[in-house]
């Protein structure tokens, strides 16, 4: 501070404790303010002094360079090419001035380039080869649509088989609820497994309990395996209706389960399959294979964890639970069809609640939304056509693993 000519009257600067009366405080503040402005003036004077010196030196250098250029330009051709040093006394000054001027110009150009250059961050989305959903304390809601893919078929026989295969899922609204064993999806969407579930049709009030599965080495011919403790004379009619619609025969085989499955979702046989359909996705000649292949191409999954039973408002602008404002994200290629699905709405789910004698839940722990992750070829994705009629919304499948 002394070198710059600055002063200080702050007693606490040296670490001494002091007490002042009001008059002393005012006088000290006044003197401190005066010294502060004096120091500011000294600093500004120093800055101006060195700035003026720098500007004067810079102007002298520019003037020297200009004089050298004019001097060289005024010489004749013979003097410009002279080699002897004694006749070229100002050559060193010229080179030095030229180098300084080049450095200044280069620095200015590089500064302008740095201001106009912005780094571009690489953006790349991760690619997921496959996605697997395994058993857990979650509920999965599968919304299955019957996509009209007849535009891509030229063979009349294939169209007839396709129409026959969709008879089972041509109802206006179907709700299914039951237990989840495992759901697996791979790149080709060939692995497709359900757990136990009870299917209730809102229109016909029929019940079915079945599972769709495909395992390595399975018989390409369609077959159904039914638990003999479940199938009795009271509920055998729905299975006959399925046999008639898909033109196949179900085979009754015991599965080693001695616990009957309740249609009202209150009792379950843990870890056992009541009905199994084995199929091969590559077998395009079979109606069931065609049906399953179309199902694999056109459904979406929403997962959530719950306390008792599930109640949903679906196909709304922002779907929420009845007693909870927790949103559910509808994923997939069929979000634009929400306004056309008038047959499967809030009132139908309440009707299903009354028939099944379920109790509404007041507390949902948490909700998770899970997209179907699979890489498909563009040609295998069904077309995004709007539904032609209300029967295009074929089924809603709900299954869960256990109560929390």
Swiss-Prot record:
Organism expressing this protein natively: Saccharomyces cerevisiae (strain ATCC 204508 / S288c) (Baker's yeast)
The protein, known as: Uncharacterized protein YBR063C
Membrane topology classification: Multi-pass membrane protein
First and last residue of the signal peptide: none
GO biological process, one term: organelle localization by membrane tethering
Keyword terms, alphabetized: Membrane, Transmembrane, Transmembrane helix
Localization per record: Membrane
GO cellular component annotations of the record: mitochondrial outer membrane; nuclear envelope; organelle membrane contact site
Main location: membrane
Lineage: superkingdom: Eukaryota
Bilayer-crossing regions: 35-55, 92-112
């Amino acid at each position: 501070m002394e070198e710059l000519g600055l002063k200080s009257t702050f007693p606490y600067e040296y670490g001494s404790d002091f007490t002042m009366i009001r008059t002393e405080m005012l006088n000290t503040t006044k003197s401190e303010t005066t010294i502060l402005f004096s120091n500011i003036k000294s600093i500004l004077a120093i800055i101006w002094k060195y700035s003026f010196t720098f500007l004067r030196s810079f102007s002298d250098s520019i003037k020297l360079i200009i004089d050298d250029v004019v001097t060289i330009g005024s010489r004749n051709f013979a003097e410009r090419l002279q080699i002897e040093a004694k006749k070229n006394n100002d050559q060193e000054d010229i080179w030095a001035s030229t180098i300084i001027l080049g450095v200044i110009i280069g620095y200015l150009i590089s500064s302008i380039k740095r201001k106009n250059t912005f780094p571009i961050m690489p953006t790349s989305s991760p690619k997921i080869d496959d996605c697997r959903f395994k058993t857990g304390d979650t509920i999965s809601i599968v919304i299955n649509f019957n996509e009209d893919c007849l535009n891509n078929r030229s063979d009349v026989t294939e169209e007839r088989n396709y129409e026959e295969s969709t008879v089972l899922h041509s109802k206006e609204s179907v709700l299914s609820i039951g237990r989840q064993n495992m759901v697996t999806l791979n790149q080709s969407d060939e692995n497709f497994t359900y757990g136990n579930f009870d299917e209730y049709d809102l229109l016909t009030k029929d019940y079915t309990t079945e599972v769709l599965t495909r395992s390595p080495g399975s018989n390409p011919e369609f077959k159904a395996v039914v638990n003999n403790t479940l199938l009795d004379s009271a509920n055998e009619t729905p299975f006959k209706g399925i046999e008639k619609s898909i033109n196949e025969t179900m085979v009754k085989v015991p599965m080693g389960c001695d616990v009957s499955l309740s249609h009202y979702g209150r009792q379950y046989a843990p870890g056992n399959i009541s009905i199994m359909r084995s199929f091969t996705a590559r077998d395009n000649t079979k109606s069931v294979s065609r049906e399953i292949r179309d199902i694999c191409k056109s459904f979406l999954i929403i997962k959530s964890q719950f306390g008792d039973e599930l109640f949903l408002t679906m196909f709304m602008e922002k779907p929420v639970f009845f007693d909870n404002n927790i949103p559910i994200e509808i994923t997939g290629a069929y979000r634009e069809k929400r306004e056309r699905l008038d047959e499967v709405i809030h009132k139908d789910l309440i009707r299903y609640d009354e028939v099944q004698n379920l109790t509404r839940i007041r507390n949902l722990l948490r909700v998770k939304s899970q997209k179907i992750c699979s890489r498909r070829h563009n040609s295998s994705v069904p077309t995004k056509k709007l539904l032609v009629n209300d029967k295009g919304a074929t089924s809603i499948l709900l299954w869960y693993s256990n109560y929390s």
